[in-house]
Amino acid sequence: MKKTFLTIIAFLLALSINAQEWVGINKSVHKRIQEKLISSSENSIIVDVDINGFYKETVKTDKGDMLIISGEDMAAMPIKGAPNLPMYPISMIVGDYAEMEIAIIKSEYVDFENVDVAPSKGNFSRQINPDDVPYTYGDMYQEDAFYPAQQASLGEPYILRDFRAQNMMVYPYSYNPVTKTLRVYTYMRIEAKKVSDNGVNQKVNRKRNNKVAPEVNALYERRFINYPSKETRYSFLEEEGEMLIVCVDEY
């Protein structure tokens, strides 16, 4: 019984993988999106992003066969009626008070013609069968313009333990529904720059730890692209020590 169950799981996974077809830009071999920190300071964070291709999946719509575009480690933009394209978040540490703005310093792209990209079905409850949700087409399907218009944006600042952070949202793919052109940004240099000390959700009067436990340090390294530049400011607690607890006899 167990062997049969595992066989079924393997079969379903194979179907899921085979449903998507990899389209490489320079090579046929799949390569996930690459991010690289170029520089990081209190006033500026510069990141390079390289994209080697995308996955396409054919779906049936009332307008015929269309494509859903996706990428590894990316999330679909959940805007109902908009072209179903993925976005990629990059988490970064920002100043405790900083208001940041984002800009594309330079970029390169490749256009794919005669591509029909399906619209997103948006967000809905897990109790709803996705196949029961119809495809609807938003106003952008009537506009001769690329969507999204920007290739990067900033999320709301948030506090994670010792740091104030912000997500750099990267949009490597954009689509013009009128010309049926899919634009793939194969390279982007993105800068998040401090413009003031009037940012929202400021980290005020919160003491930062001088020592960071190894597991927390590992969390920071995985999450924040610019965390290594902070390492010289903090010492890490490499091993657990003994604790002295003082209390009255009743306890």
Where are these regions (language model features)?
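Extracellular pro-sequences of secreted precursors
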Residues: A19-Y251
